[in-house]
């Protein structure tokens, strides 16, 4: 299948999933995408780790967070971010109403300045798409390509920018007046 002159290559990677998620839809969905899924009892319950990309996701249901004590789920999140440098909290709710947004705000306040990013999702498909997109864009061949394209775009913008050209003319004119 060709797409704009290039063949589209299916991205697959190895994913370490907490054994607590083995019977959940999210694990099945990742397996169905042809990823190499490994289950582990040694990772935090509810975690999904894309080891080649260096990203980790902690899946939590907002209802469960709201029903449990704040100290319990905050301790779980803290343990997770202390282990994983590039961490995401995936908060799932069918509808993100006022209570769910208050919960996210409390978590953001508690972990302000930490390496935790919060992803509100509505369903499994939404969660899988977000996790795979983040993992794919942070994996080695893709991140190199993205960096190259950003550098190229920056160079093009600088080269074609009328503001940049005006600044260069001003600098050239000031250099001819000022002999230093």
Swiss-Prot record:
Principal location: nucleus
Domain of life according to the entry: Eukaryota
Signal peptide: none
This protein's record includes keyword Glycoprotein: no
Gene Ontology biological process: reciprocal meiotic recombination; synaptonemal complex assembly
Coiled-coil region(s): none
Job description of the protein: Plays a key role in reinforcing the integrity of the central element of the synaptonemal complex (SC) thereby stabilizing SC, ensuring progression of meiotic prophase I in male and female germ cells. Promotes homologous recombination and crossing-over in meiotic prophase I via its association with SHOC1. Required for the localization of TEX11 and MSH4 to recombination intermediates.
Assembly notes: Homooligomer. Interacts with SHOC, SYCP1 and SYCE3.
Record InterPro entries: SCRE
Naturally occurring in which organism (per UniProt): Homo sapiens (Human)
Cell location: Chromosome
GO cellular component: chromosome
Name this protein carries in UniProt: Protein SPO16 homolog
């Amino acid at each position: 299948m060709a797409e704009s002159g290039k063949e589209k290559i299916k991205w697959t990677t190895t994913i370490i999933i907490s054994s607590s998620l083995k019977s959940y839809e999210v694990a099945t969905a990742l397996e169905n995408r042809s990823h190499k899924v490994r289950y582990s009892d040694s990772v935090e319950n509810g975690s999904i780790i894309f080891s080649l990309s260096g990203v980790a996701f902690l899946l939590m249901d907002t209802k469960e967070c709201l029903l449990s004590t704040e100290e319990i789920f905050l301790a779980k999140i803290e343990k997770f971010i202390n282990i994983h440098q590039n961490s995401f909290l995936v908060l799932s709710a069918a509808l993100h109403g006022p209570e769910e947004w208050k919960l996210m705000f409390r978590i953001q306040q508690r972990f302000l300045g930490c390496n935790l990013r919060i992803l509100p999702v509505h369903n499994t498909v939404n969660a899988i798409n977000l996790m795979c997109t983040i993992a794919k864009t942070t994996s080695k061949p893709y991140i190199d390509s993205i960096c190259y394209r950003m550098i190229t775009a920056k160079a093009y913008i600088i080269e074609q920018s009328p503001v940049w050209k005006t600044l260069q003319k001003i600098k050239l004119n000031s250099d001819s007046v000022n002999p230093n």
